[in-house]
Amino acid sequence: MARRDRVIITIGGTGVGPRNRTPEATEPHIDTLLPGLMTQILFSGLSNTAQAGLSRGLVGLSSRDSTAALIVNAPSSSGGVRDALGVVCPLFGSIFERL
């Protein structure tokens, strides 16, 4: 994040398996969790498959100022990525206008 990336999307590693550690790896970089967006992504996924409930992905901001990056953990499935992007992409402007 040294280059001041504004959006960081990880794909995969959000499941319940022992090698799925993406939320644990990204959590130290998140200053403010956005549980509403996590819930929206979950609901979007659940409308397609019950397996969406197994994702542990996080969504949050690295800070609450003009240098903030939005961090999104998307599942590895193409449907999970579509769900996550379908929720967060339309909100980029609203999120960054408030910082």
Residue map of PLM features:
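Non-catalytic beta/alpha edge segments that cap or flank active sites
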Residues: M1-L99
